[in-house]
Amino acid sequence: MASTCSFDIVSDFEWQELVNAIDQANREIKARYDLKDTKTEIKLDPTEITISTDSEFTLDAVHNVLQTKAVKRKLSLKIFDYGIIESASGNRVRQAIKLQKGIDTELAKKISKLIRTDYKKVQASIQGEVVRVSSKSKDDLQQVMQDLKQEDWPVALQFTNYR
């Protein structure tokens, strides 16, 4: 009769879109009059972005450029976890921005508990950094997605692996 339907809740981002956003930000920084001579560098590592520039004022402008480019590439700003601003050599400042990927166990438990309390016919199971939601009714699953989108979570949630 009715088979079980499911989907996964993940927190992830497109790596290539992030690379493109940083490339566009670097180009704009080199072309903008107020940022042209600041020798600003944006370096991308697999786990973080490092920004090195002249002053905190310039750093704020670079943040603005980076965020604008990320939004245009359909990246959530919740993937950026800004670290502390530290002074570097030559009167420069540096900041590391950690890239948030995956749902930690505590947040997965909150999501799972919210689903279990609000929907009796829906099951949520934690599988590492993924929360699998399953039910016999597709309508219930769609309602769960709508309710999760309404909440303000500390990470960007995506829904994948529809079955």
Swiss-Prot record:
Gene3D superfamilies: 3.30.70.860, YajQ-like, domain 2. PANTHER family: UPF0234 PROTEIN YAJQ. This is Nucleotide-binding protein AM1_1863. Keywords: Nucleotide-binding. Coiled coil: none annotated. The lineage of its organism: Bacteria, Bacillati, Cyanobacteriota, Cyanophyceae, Acaryochloridales. SUPFAM superfamilies: YajQ-like. Transmembrane segments: none annotated.
